[in-house]
Each structure stands twice: as structure tokens, then as C-alpha cells.
């Protein structure tokens, strides 16, 4: 019996211990569950924003049934900084936002006004018309209006005067003036210097003005021509002119070589004025975009001509989407006018496209919110912090990465006078030294002559100066006198 009682007591004790252990484990599991709920509580209580956007590469794209792109990364960074959750929806009508014929706003702006979305995170341009109905944050991207072209449709045609292209018109004008001035200085110095003739009253000087022009032209061709200078003053001018022509020809050959080697990279359409003047390409923009209304409201005559062209051919030249515009540029003779930053992306993705140099209408992409929304200022401060930390630059480089191998050659342009400023200055100094040397030579001769004829040096110098500057008249008078004597 004792053994039986001990056995029963052991069984009861074991059952009680197991029951307490099970109850304690259950208590611990309930506590853990309660703790997990507390951790999820703050996440579940985060404000949820409905975000409207538009599908445009590289801002928002659909890949593997998920959205990604520049704006999605930006939205994630803002949500992390401001502690909110979000739901992203693509705008129903596929438009950015403009006033329709019935006075209502379309696109993402319309969805915010109808309270279908809280904010719009997209390449949405900040304009005065949109600012009147919604609020914008600080721009997260800066852009402008540019011209997207196809390279092979814009190869520059050679003209008969293409050889003049290495220098600008101002440079050619300066060179012509320098040539005439140098030849005149040669002519003047040769007449003043006593070393260029023995008897100026009886002998004609070899450096006439026509001969001086011929001498200067021969130096331009790197050819030695007569007359040969004998005086130091004339040789100074001749030497400085030779150095000038050598440097000038080197600059011309280098720039002309760069012009020929650049080939099709030289765009005849550099500006919007060039676009209006040409007749080879059609041009247009996105229908209802801020770019279209920029030209409509502009007072610039060139911009008005662009608007009138697009408005008259609205059904033919205006496109519905950015992807359609890029494809049309690649497939036909069409130039697309739009956001320069988007055109840079197209040129990076498609190596046969290029953006014209001129960019007008500086503007920015901002996040749109409802007016008086408490999120406007918060988002603006967050965007500024992302810019200051370099995160916006990182996103820009990440999504605008190019697959093209661009040559590191700079775009060619005609040589301007400023580039040859030092060369012109050297020539001017040489001409001045030559004239001074000629005056010194004539002064020395006048001083020696004054000692023989018992006259002042100044009077002799003046007589010599007048005689040499009127030598042709004196020679003609002497010839007429000799002719009368023979008669």
C-alpha cells in the first residue's frame, strides 16, 4: 500500500507540475504577442498619403509588376524622413494637368483638386497657372526648354565660302584692318628711314604703297618677295608681321581641321531662331503641356512664331506622350521641343539623338499638394535637406546614366577676336617700335646734317620729313623741269 500510495502521489505531482509549466508558457506567449502589437502600433498609426503620378521614363516605370524610378526613390526618401506611408496611383487620363475647355483641370492637378490624391510626385513643372489652384514644394529638379534632334537629319551642308568658317566675321574684319595698317606702316617707315634710299630727292623709294601691300601678302603666303628691307626699322615691322602670319596660319589650319573632322556633329540648328528659319524639320511639343503654354504666353517674336506654327498644325505636330515624341524624332524629320532634362535622358539612351545647345525658360519640377496643405512646408524642407546632403545628385546620376560612348571632343565654334588678342597686341607693339626706330634714324641723320649746313636740328628734321612724305611730288616736278629744259 505504501508503494501504491507513493506511486499515486508521484503521478499527481507530475501532473500538477506539467499543468503549471503549460500555464506559465501560455502566459509568456500572451506577453510576447502583446509586445508585438505595441511595435506595430506606431506603424499602423502613420498617416497614409495617396500619391498620384504619371508613367514616364526614368521618373516612374513599371518593372516586374512594381513601380520604380527617380520619383519612386524620392518618395521613399521623403516617407522615411517625414514618417508617413503612401499609396501610389497612376493618373487616370495620363496627363500632367491643364485647364480643359469646360474650365476643369485635367491630369494630376485635377485629381488633387477633386481630392482623389493628396500629393503628386512626378516631373510636374511649376507654373503660375498651376500655382493658383495648388501648392508646390521647392523644386527637386531644375530644367528648361530645349530642342531634341536626330543627328543624321541635321548634318551641316558645305557652302562655297566654307573656308571662311574657321574665323568669325569680327576676326576676319580685324585681320583685314591689321593687314592694311601693317602695309601702311611699312610704306611710312620706309620713306622716313634714310637707309632705304641714298638720295630721296632724285631716287624713287622701292617701298611704294602697292609694293608694301605685295610684301604683306607675300608674308601671308609664307613667301619672300621684293623689295627687301634694308633699314632696321623696316626689318622690325617685317619680322613682327612674319611672326604674326605664322601664328595666324597655325590657328587657321588647326581650326579648319577641327571643323572638317567634326562633320555631322555641327548642328545648323543651335537656337530656336534657327529652328524657325529652317524648312526641313517639323517641330512640336506635348499637347497641353506647360511648354506649349510657355510659347503661347511669351511676348518674344520668335516664341510667338513657334506657337503659331504648332497651333495651326496642332493635330499633326503635337504629341500625346513623351515616348511618342522620342520615337517620332527617331523615325521622321521631326524636332521635339520639351523639358531639357528629359531630352538629356533621351540622348543618353539613344545615341543617334542630340539636344541643341540653347535652353530657355528655366523652371523646376515640384511636388504638388492641395492649397493650405500641412504637407507642403514639410516636403519642401525635406527636399532641401536631400539636396544639401547630395542625395538628389545621387538619384540624378543613378537614373540618367548613359549607355552611349561619347567622344570627349568639345563642340567646334569659329575663332573669336578675343582668342587672338595677344597676337594683335604683339603686332601693335612691333609696329610702334618700327615707327619709333624710323624716327630715331631720321633724327640721327638730321643731327649730322645740321652740323654741316649750320641749321638747327629741328628745322633739318622738319625739312627731311616733308621731303620724304612729298617725294613723289618733288620727283614729278623735277621730271617736268627737265622736260622743259630738253624742249
Curated annotation (Swiss-Prot):
Regarding the membrane, this protein is recorded as: Multi-pass membrane protein
**What are the TM regions of this chain, as residue ranges?**
170-190, 236-256, 420-440
Q: What ranges does the Cytoplasmic topological domain annotation cover?
A: 191-235, 441-487
Signal peptide (residue range):
1-23
Pfam family of the protein (one) = Lig_chan-Glu_bd
Where does this protein chiefly localize?
A: membrane
At which residues is glycosylation annotated? 104
Q: Which residues lie on this side of the membrane: Extracellular?
A: 24-169, 257-419
Keyword Cell division recorded: no
InterPro entries xrefs: Glu/Gly-bd, Iono_Glu_rcpt_met, Ionotropic_Glu_rcpt, Iontro_rcpt_C
Keywords noted in UniProt: Cell membrane, Glycoprotein, Ion channel, Ion transport, Ligand-gated ion channel, Membrane, Postsynaptic cell membrane, Receptor, Signal, Synapse, Transmembrane, Transmembrane helix, Transport
- What are the protein's GO molecular function terms? ligand-gated monoatomic ion channel activity; signaling receptor activity
For this record, an example GO cellular component is: postsynaptic membrane
Q: Where in the cell is it found?
A: Cell membrane; Postsynaptic cell membrane
Q: What does the sequence similarity comment in the record state about its family?
A: Belongs to the glutamate-gated ion channel (TC 1.A.10.1) family.
Q: What does this protein do?
A: Receptor for glutamate. L-glutamate acts as an excitatory neurotransmitter at many synapses in the central nervous system. The postsynaptic actions of Glu are mediated by a variety of receptors that are named according to their selective agonists.
Name by which UniProt lists this protein = Probable glutamate receptor
Organism in which the protein naturally occurs:
Anas platyrhynchos
* Source lineage: Eukaryota, Metazoa, Chordata, Craniata, Vertebrata
Amino acid at each position: 500500500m505504501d508503494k501504491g500510495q507513493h506511486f499515486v502521489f508521484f503521478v499527481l505531482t507530475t501532473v500538477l507540475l506539467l499543468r503549471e509549466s503549460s500555464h506559465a508558457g501560455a502566459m509568456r506567449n500572451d506577453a510576447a504577442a502583446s509586445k508585438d502589437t505595441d511595435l506595430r502600433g506606431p506603424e499602423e498609426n502613420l498617416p497614409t498619403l495617396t500619391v498620384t503620378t504619371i508613367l514616364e521614363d526614368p521618373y516612374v516605370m513599371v518593372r516586374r509588376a512594381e513601380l520604380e524610378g527617380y520619383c519612386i526613390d524620392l518618395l521613399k526618401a521623403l516617407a522615411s524622413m517625414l514618417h508617413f506611408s503612401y499609396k501610389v496611383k497612376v493618373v487616370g487620363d495620363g496627363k500632367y494637368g491643364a485647364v480643359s475647355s469646360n474650365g476643369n483641370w485635367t491630369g494630376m492637378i485635377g485629381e488633387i483638386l477633386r481630392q482623389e490624391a493628396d500629393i503628386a510626385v512626378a516631373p510636374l513643372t511649376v507654373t503660375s497657372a498651376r500655382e493658383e489652384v495648388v501648392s508646390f514644394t521647392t523644386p527637386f529638379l531644375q530644367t528648361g526648354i530645349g530642342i531634341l534632334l536626330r543627328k543624321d537629319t541635321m548634318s551641316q551642308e558645305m557652302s562655297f565660302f566654307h573656308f571662311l568658317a574657321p574665323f568669325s566675321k569680327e576676326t576676319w574684319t580685324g585681320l583685314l584692318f591689321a593687314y592694311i595698317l601693317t602695309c601702311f606702316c611699312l610704306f611710312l617707315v620706309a620713306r622716313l628711314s634714310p637707309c632705304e634710299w641714298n638720295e630721296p630727292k632724285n631716287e624713287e623709294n622701292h617701298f611704294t604703297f602697292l609694293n608694301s601691300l605685295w610684301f604683306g601678302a607675300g608674308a601671308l603666303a609664307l613667301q619672300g618677295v621684293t623689295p627687301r628691307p634694308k633699314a632696321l626699322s623696316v626689318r622690325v615691322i617685317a619680322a613682327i608681321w612674319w611672326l604674326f602670319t605664322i601664328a595666324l596660319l597655325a590657328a587657321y589650319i588647326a581650326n579648319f581641321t577641327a571643323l572638317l573632322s567634326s562633320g555631322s556633329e555641327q548642328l545648323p540648328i543651335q537656337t530656336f531662331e534657327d529652328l524657325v528659319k529652317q524648312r526641313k524639320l517639323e517641330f512640336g511639343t506635348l499637347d497641353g503641356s506647360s511648354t506649349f503654354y510657355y510659347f503661347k504666353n511669351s511676348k518674344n517674336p520668335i516664341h510667338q512664331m513657334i506657337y503659331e506654327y504648332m497651333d495651326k498644325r496642332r493635330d499633326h505636330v503635337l504629341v500625346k506622350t513623351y515616348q511618342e515624341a522620342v520615337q517620332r524624332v527617331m523615325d521622321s524629320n521631326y524636332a521635339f521641343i520639351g523639358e531639357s532634362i528629359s531630352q538629356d535622358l533621351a540622348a543618353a539612351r539613344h545615341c543617334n539623338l542630340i539636344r541643341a545647345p540653347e535652353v530657355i525658360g528655366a523652371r523646376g519640377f515640384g511636388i504638388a499638394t492641395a492649397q493650405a496643405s500641412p504637407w507642403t512646408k514639410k516636403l519642401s524642407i525635406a527636399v532641401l535637406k536631400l539636396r544639401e546632403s547630395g542625395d538628389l545628385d545621387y538619384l540624378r546620376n543613378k537614373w540618367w546614366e548613359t549607355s552611349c560612348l561619347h567622344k570627349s571632343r568639345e563642340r567646334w565654334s569659329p575663332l573669336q577676336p578675343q582668342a587672338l588678342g595677344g597676337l594683335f597686341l604683339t603686332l601693335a607693339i612691333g609696329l610702334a617700335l618700327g615707327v619709333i626706330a624710323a624716327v630715331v634714324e631720321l633724327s640721327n641723320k638730321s643731327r649730322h646734317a645740321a652740323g654741316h649746313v649750320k641749321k638747327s636740328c629741328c628745322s633739318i628734321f622738319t625739312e627731311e620729313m616733308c621731303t620724304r612724305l612729298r617725294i613723289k611730288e618733288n620727283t614729278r616736278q623735277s621730271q617736268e623741269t627737265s622736260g622743259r629744259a630738253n624742249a
